[in-house]
């Protein structure tokens, strides 16, 4: 499960259910990976992931567009990334164990893999998810699936 951290800033703690174990806590970042000012302080848990959540273009009724910000916006984007990971795993289930991917540990491992390169931590120690670190369009699909399998084998 993924859950938004909160938009109450550093004066408040991470909201429920994002502060629970086995829940991926999602914070907001700007387009450069800097943690949003409205994020709460990182929790003691390891799952302090950030992803784009500021000034994201959103559709409204009547065809209007507006920009939205928040950890809930970031959580929707993180859920979309998780869905792409699951879809990749389902395309070739012999290469990637579906059951491992459909778990907290599986998605967490993929998010960690997307945020472990040098420079992907925000200044306050959150993990900035960069989907292109794993889902590289310049790599063959078999290579990406092999990399995903390798990550899951290390769980």
Give, region by region, the residue ranges found by the protein language model:
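C-terminal subdomain of the subtilisin-like protease fold in secreted/lumenal serine endopeptidases
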Residues: 87-155
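Extracellular S/T/G-rich loop segment that most often corresponds to the catalytic His/Ser-adjacent loop
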Residues: 4, 13-90
